[in-house]
């Protein structure tokens, strides 16, 4: 009787290989549709259902996944008036971990290559989920002038968040505030670029820990890049009026400090700088961030900020063109909006506005972090550990 041929383990599954080799092996196996899937970060507080304590993947998520996979999900456990999730309708920490595991398992088992998801959550001053510890808002934390305390606080936030299977946060906010009328001032570390830098580095260090594949570490996303905290009239997302020296010395200084400290994600902002929307500002996203500072992580857009390039800034012909401009500039993942949808990316490729190499570049950066996080080896969290944390 003939012996069944042994199935050879793909190189990207071999944890003994260097991460760049694993990324390269996985990337060459991917179809264009699977690559585009990795560029998307979908809103996901409706990705599961809770029927009398039974957690299941929702029909909405099944449709979104569509066989091509996704790069990441945003706000699976987010509970606040904006999502409509309340103490009555939401779920606690243990059930939250079960929900994240269920979604992750479905994504791995129902896609060809089984690429795990990154779960991105809001953690400005605690995991914005039911049962998360609530700490003082950043403006209050900065008032302590105690970076060591902020590092300890954010390490606790990271431990709670990772215990529920979530691996990234949309914080810290590094906007330097010079107009108290701006409605997001409490999210920041204040008006002084040196203090913002020191507190930002402390937060990044606390969130990311020594190794991103440890049980108490998550990716820190520094935001909003750039000059988002100085809007005209204090109106959110309005243009800032800053010159090149002010931009460098005041607005960019905290970002540079946090990149040097190892921050692995940057969020591009809604606003424009001197007429150029920040989410397609190649001089910032590639020239400064990568060429000058040596950033190796991935850039994610603020929610809908790529679509805003077209709709509000009128700097693109349509949403597909906006997506092409953002991808070329250096935005690797889109948080909602349609600029990086299957239809938009394919249309931009057809028009010659982007090349598949640009798609590969972004996917490569995202996959690298999934390997750094250890998600291919350990995609699920230990539900029993949640209550211990």
Residue ranges and their predicted role:
Residues 1-389:
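Glycoside hydrolase catalytic-domain context in secreted enzymes
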């Amino acid at each position: 009787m003939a012996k069944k041929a042994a199935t050879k383990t793909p190189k990207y599954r071999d944890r003994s290989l260097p991460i760049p080799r694993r990324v390269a092996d996985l990337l060459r196996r991917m179809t264009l549709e699977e690559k585009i899937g990795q560029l998307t970060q979908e809103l996901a507080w409706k990705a599961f259902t809770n029927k009398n304590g039974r957690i299941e993947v929702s029909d909405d998520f099944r449709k979104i996944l569509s066989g091509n996979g996704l790069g990441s999900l945003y706000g699976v456990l987010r509970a606040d008036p904006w999502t409509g999730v309340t103490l009555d309708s939401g779920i606690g920490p243990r059930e939250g971990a079960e929900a994240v595991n269920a979604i992750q398992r479905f994504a791995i088992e129902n896609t060809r290559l089984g690429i795990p998801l990154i779960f991105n959550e809001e953690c400005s001053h605690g995991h914005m989920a039911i049962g998360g510890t609530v700490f003082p808002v950043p403006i209050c934390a900065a008032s302590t002038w105690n970076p060591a305390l902020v590092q300890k606080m954010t390490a606790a936030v990271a431990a709670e968040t990772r215990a529920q299977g979530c691996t990234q946060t949309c914080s810290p906010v590094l906007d330097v505030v010079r107009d108290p009328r701006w409605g997001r001032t409490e999210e920041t570390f204040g008006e002084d670029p040196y203090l913002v830098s020191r507190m930002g580095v402390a937060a990044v260090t606390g969130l990311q820990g020594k190794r991103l594949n440890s049980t108490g570490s998550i990716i820190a996303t520094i935001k909003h890049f750039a000059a988002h905290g100085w809007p005209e009239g204090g109106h959110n997302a309005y243009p800032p009026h800053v010159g090149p020296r002010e931009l460098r010395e005041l607005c960019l200084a905290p970002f540079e400090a946090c990149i040097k400290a190892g921050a692995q994600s940057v969020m591009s902002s809604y606003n424009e700088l001197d007429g150029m929307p920040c989410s397609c500002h190649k001089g910032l996203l590639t020239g400064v961030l990568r060429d000058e500072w040596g950033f190796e992580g991935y850039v994610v857009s603020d929610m809908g900020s790529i679509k805003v390039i077209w709709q509000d800034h009128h700097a693109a012909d349509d949403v597909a063109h906006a997506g092409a401009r953002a991808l070329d500039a250096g935005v690797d993942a889109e948080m909602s909006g349609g600029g990086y949808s299957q239809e938009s990316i394919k249309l931009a490729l057809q028009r010659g506005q982007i090349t598949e190499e640009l798609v590969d570049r972004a996917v490569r950066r995202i996959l690298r972090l999934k390997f750094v996080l250890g998600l291919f080896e350990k995609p699920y969290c230990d539900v029993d550990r949640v209550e211990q944390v």
